[in-house]
Every structure is written in C-alpha cells, then in structure tokens.
C-alpha cells in the first residue's frame, strides 16, 4: 500500500496521467520479488504483460508502457526510466524512513549473512546504506520528493559517525546487550 499511495501522490502532480495504469504498475512492480530478488523487475513485468485479464483492460501500447515502467523501478537502474510511469514508480518505491531502512538491512543481513558478528553486521549496514542513500548513492528519485530529500539528509547526518550509527542500528533492531554495545566502540 505504501508504494501505491506514493505513486498516486506523484501522479497527481501531472495532467493526463492514467491512474489505472499507475495503480497496475504499483501493484505489479514487486510481484515476483519472492521468486528472484535480483531479476524481480523483469519477472514482474512479464507476469503483467502475459496476464490475459490485463489484455482486456489495456491497449497494446499501454501494456508496453506499463511493462517498461515495472522494469524501470529498481533503485540500481543505470538509466533514466523510459516514461513518466517509470519515474513515478521508481520514485514511489524509494524508502523515506531511516528506521525501516535499518530494520530491512538487519533482516536481510541475518538471513543472508548469519555468520557475521555484531560489528560485521553494523559495518555491512553502514556500507549498504551509504552506497544506496549516501551523497553518491545509487538510489534516485526522478520527481520532486521532499520526503526523500529529508530522508537523505537524515541518512547523511547518521552516517557522519559510525559509532552513533551503530547505536541507532542496535536500538532500532532491539539489540540491547550492553556487552555488545561496548564492542561497537571498536568500529
């Protein structure tokens, strides 16, 4: 619902936007994430494009635009989205909350890197958030987004001090062991 709501917020900034297309792009954009995280945008776009019901509602041209928009939503996309619908979904899909970023990064780390100790988890989270949302981060928005701008400023502030970052990471993820807190001073 988060991405759908943000998509409508962005869509309302423009005239002649088909809100049905916006809704479908937002609804399908991560549909295949559970199948293959690394290629989910292509798989999700294909699930949409091959869906017989969608062929009843949208023209061939509209379906092509929707497919392209779904493919273009990734934060790591190396080019500008091909349509306004791609810019809307790509911008809407950006996280604007530091707490959820820290929680998502922690959950991903625990699942995919269970061997890491606390310092390594914090370092991984620090590096990931810096690479994605820092000054030269790859996550972009293609439309005016004051929420994302504020989020980027919050991230910039948090990344200034690794120790403060580590404390915040632990607080957000309910890591309260005081022995562990002492360990992060070595970061």
Predicted feature descriptions by range:
Residues 1-21, 34, 43, 48-56:
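Alpha-helical phosphate/pyrophosphate-handling elements in metalloenzyme active cores
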Residues 1-16, 28, 77-187:
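Divalent metal-dependent phosphate-bond-processing catalytic cores, especially two-metal-ion Mg2+/Mn2+ enzymes
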Residues 17-40, 44, 65-75:
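His-Asp-centered metal-binding catalytic motifs of divalent-metal-dependent phosphohydrolases/nucleases
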Residues 39, 45, 50, 106, ...:
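General N-terminal targeting signals
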Residues 42-84:
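Helix-adjacent hinge/juxtasegments
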């Amino acid at each position: 619902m988060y991405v759908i709501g943000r998509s409508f917020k962005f869509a309302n900034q423009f005239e002649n936007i088909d809100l049905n297309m916006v809704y479908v792009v937002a609804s399908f954009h991560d549909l295949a994430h559970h199948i293959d995280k690394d290629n989910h945008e292509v798989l999700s776009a294909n699930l949409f494009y091959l869906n017989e019901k969608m062929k009843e509602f949208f023209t061939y041209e509209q379906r092509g635009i929707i497919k392209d928009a779904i493919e273009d939503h990734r934060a790591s996309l190396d080019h500008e989205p091909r349509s306004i619908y791609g810019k809307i979904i790509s911008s809407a899909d950006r996280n604007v909350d530091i707490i959820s970023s820290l929680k998502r990064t922690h959950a991903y780390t625990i699942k995919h890197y269970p061997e890491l100790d606390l310092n390594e988890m914090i370092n991984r989270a620090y590096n990931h958030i810096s690479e994605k949302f820092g000054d030269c981060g790859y996550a972009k928005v293609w439309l005016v987004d004051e929420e994302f701008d504020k989020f980027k400023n919050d991230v910039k502030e948090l990344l200034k001090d690794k120790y403060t970052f580590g404390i915040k990471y632990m607080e957000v993820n309910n890591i309260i062991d005081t022995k562990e807190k002492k360990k992060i001073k070595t970061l």
